[in-house]
From Swiss-Prot:
Keywords: Cytoplasm, Glycosyltransferase, Purine salvage, Transferase. Coiled coil: none annotated. Belongs to the purine/pyrimidine phosphoribosyltransferase family. Archaeal HPRT subfamily. CDD domains: PRTases_typeI (cd06223). InterPro entries: HGPRTase-like, PRibTrfase_dom, PRTase-like, Pur/Pyrimidine_PRTase. It holds the Pfam family Pribosyltran. The gene is hpt. Its EC number is 2.4.2.8. It is found in: Cytoplasm. The lineage of its organism: Archaea, Methanobacteriati, Methanobacteriota, Methanomada group, Methanococci. Can be used as a counterselectable marker when transforming this organism. Catalyzes a salvage reaction resulting in the formation of IMP that is energically less costly than de novo synthesis. This is Hypoxanthine/guanine phosphoribosyltransferase.
Length: 185
């Protein structure tokens, strides 16, 4: 299996904002450049890890979108984006989201009761986004089959499981130490 994702993480820039060290990577930030080879590698690995017998893939705005698009094209599974603004469509479900760096609302549309779904996102750190997505999908009556994040940084997997009962699959677990990304698994 290709390790393009891991190799690209080891060399990505780190930016300090306050006391937090952000890693800047094409999968999590869309900069400096998203290479098709990396997106193909990641989406291929995702497809091998998820239940593809589903009706829809769900992600949150914004950086889950490139990954979900690639997976959708390869599997012919349509996707839904939870947006950061409301559209006032009938049946729209608002849900509060709190992450390690922001708070706000997410809005779910396009999910029907009984839809079999998978959740796919770019990074999990605090778990706040995934908890919000899961809560909205439960309110909609969806059947959540899989939850997967590409990059795991932090304790978010445990938090999501404690708060929702869902296990989060990840491709790679990292930490940022001394200005660089270390691959843990």
């Amino acid at each position: 299996m290709s390790k393009l994702l891991e190799e690209s993480l080891k060399t990505c820039p780190i930016v300090k904002r306050g006391e937090y060290h952000y890693f800047i990577h094409p999968i999590s930030d869309g900069v400096p450049l998203v290479e098709p080879e990396l997106l193909r590698d990641v989406s291929t690995r995702v497809i091998k890890m998820i239940d593809t017998d589903v009706d829809k893939i769900v992600t949150a705005e914004a950086m889950g979108i490139p990954i979900v698009t690639a997976v959708s094209i390869a599997t012919d599974i349509p996707y839904v984006i939870m947006r950061k603004r409301e559209y006032l469509l009938e049946g729209e479900i608002p849900v509060h989201q709190e992450t390690g760096y922001s708070k706000g609302e997410l809005y779910l549309n396009g999910i029907n009761k009984g839809d079999k779904v998978i959740i796919l996102d770019d990074v999990i750190s605090t778990g706040g986004t995934l908890v919000a997505i899961i809560n909205a999908l439960k309110r909609a009556g969806a059947d959540i089959k899989d939850v997967l994040c590409i990059i795991d940084r932090g304790n978010g997997q445990n938090i999501v499981e404690e708060k929702t009962g869902y296990k989060v699959k990840t491709i790679v677990k990292i930490e940022v130490v001394d200005g660089k990304v270390n691959i843990l698994e």
